[in-house]
A protein has these predicted regions:
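Hydrophobic membrane-targeting alpha-helices
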Residues: 30, 55-63, 104, 108, ...
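Transmembrane catalytic cores of multi-pass membrane glycosyltransferases
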Residues: 1, 7, 19-24, 129-141, ...
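Membrane-embedded helix bundles of polyisoprenyl
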Residues: 50-62, 70-150, 158-177, 337-338
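Membrane-interface coil-to-helix junctions
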Residues: 1-56, 80, 91-92, 195-199
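Hydrophobic alpha-helical transmembrane segments of multi-pass membrane proteins
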Residues: 40-51, 88-92, 128, 173, ...
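Membrane-interface junctions at the ends of membrane-embedded or membrane-associated helices
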Residues: 62-67, 107-118, 146-157, 240-246, ...
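Signature aromatic-anchored transmembrane alpha helix within multi-pass, membrane-resident enzymes
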Residues: 73, 313-346
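Membrane-helix boundary/interfacial segments in multi-pass membrane proteins
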Residues: 85-93, 248-317, 346-350
């Protein structure tokens, strides 16, 4: 069986090296190793829903602690919406597990025990470095800096998490790193001609990333989730102005999640500007041809985290009417996903 072999030729595309394909130590790949294709696909599809929903709820429970029971319903609803998103099947589990990574890192930050480092090390079993790992590590380094400044002391716990997570990716995707670092094989992306857009073209790409699904990240947010989040954010701003408490608005979690979405969209747009892309490749030569605009792959999770925060704001009014509106909004958000004819939306097409 060439699946576990090294230096073997795989009978596809006229014959390519097995080492050029993804690692065998990945949950989604393992499904196809031991199951018929149809059942492996279905199992992976439903695992994506289970992992996406479960990890989202775990994160919400960890963040809100004793207050979590108050938001349990909308946490499950928003998590289910995230799990149902018709994301690229081969990496659907990697998309779905993003909240799990955040959950583990929060436990590490709070000194919950050394075994959380072990869980972080094996996390790449669910993930994929080229789509998510590189950016998780970059975000984690930023978190170390920000938390250290905020706490006025170096955050060693999260700093240690950086090499632990990196080592996990190297071990679980050893073929990828072997090809990248110890092989003279050139990737097709090194020779691909990328767009070099002007200012208006870059703005168009940023707008597209903010409003529509990009690549394999079909978040289905523009129809309903985006308007709900913007309306609630404006409502929070108006309330803060009326109470002369803009400081509270500036600390709004919803605001910062939406700003992170905008940042990811900015990076996506700037990728299509030749000088900016050239600067990135000059600073990091081994990553020449790497699509660093994949920051947008984190936006599906961020959009439904923003939805949860918007619904939570309605719950926090303490009024039954707004709670019912929040519950209705959660149902509509799920219906939009199920009824959208997206490429990988098996619930719609079947």
């Amino acid at each position: 069986n060439s699946w576990f072999a090294h230096g073997a030729t795989v009978p596809m595309l006229g014959g390519i090296s097995r080492d050029s394909l993804s690692s065998e130590w990945n949950l989604y790949n393992i499904l196809y190793t031991f199951m018929p294709v149809f059942w492996a696909y279905l199992t992976g599809y439903f695992l994506k829903i289970l992992i996406g929903t479960g990890s989202f709820v775990l994160l919400a429970k960890d963040v809100y602690q004793k207050a979590y029971p108050r938001y349990r319903g909308i946490a499950w609803a928003a998590g289910l919406c995230y799990g149902l998103l018709p994301l690229f099947p081969a990496y659907g589990i990697a998309f779905a597990s993003i909240p799990l990574a955040v959950f583990i890192l929060r436990r590490i930050y709070r000194k919950e025990g050394k075994w959380w480092y072990a869980l972080l090390f094996v996390y790449p079993f669910l993930s994929y470095f080229s789509y998510f790992g590189f950016f998780l590590l970059a975000y984690l380094v930023c978190a170390v800096v920000i938390v250290s400044i905020r706490d006025k002391k170096f955050c060693g716990r999260l700093a240690v998490a950086v090499p632990v997570l990196a080592a996990g990716y190297v071990c679980f995707e050893y073929r990828l790193f072997g090809q990248m670092l110890f092989s003279d094989v050139k990737t097709i992306r090194e020779t691909m001609v990328e767009s070099n857009l002007n200012f208006s073209g870059v703005l168009g790409q940023i707008r597209e990333a903010f409003l529509t699904p990009v690549f394999h990240a079909a978040s289905d947010h523009a129809v309903f989730v985006l308007p709900v989040c913007v309306i609630v954010l404006v409502w929070q701003l108006v309330a803060a102005v009326q109470k002369k408490n803009l400081k509270k608005f500036k600390s709004s979690t919803l605001l910062w999640v939406l700003l992170l979405i905008v940042f990811n969209c900015l990076v996506y747009g700037l990728y299509f500007q030749g000088d900016f892309r050239g600067l990135f490749e000059t600073l990091l030569p081994p990553l020449k041809g790497f699509q660093f605009n994949r920051t947008v792959f984190f936006n599906p999770f961020l959009w439904y985290a923003a939805l949860f925060l918007a619904l939570k704001a309605l719950y926090d009014t303490g009024k039954l009417f707004w709670k019912r509106i929040a519950n209705l909004a959660a149902c509509i958000a799920a219906a939009v996903i199920l009824l959208t004819p997206a490429v990988y939306n098996e619930f719609y097409w079947t």
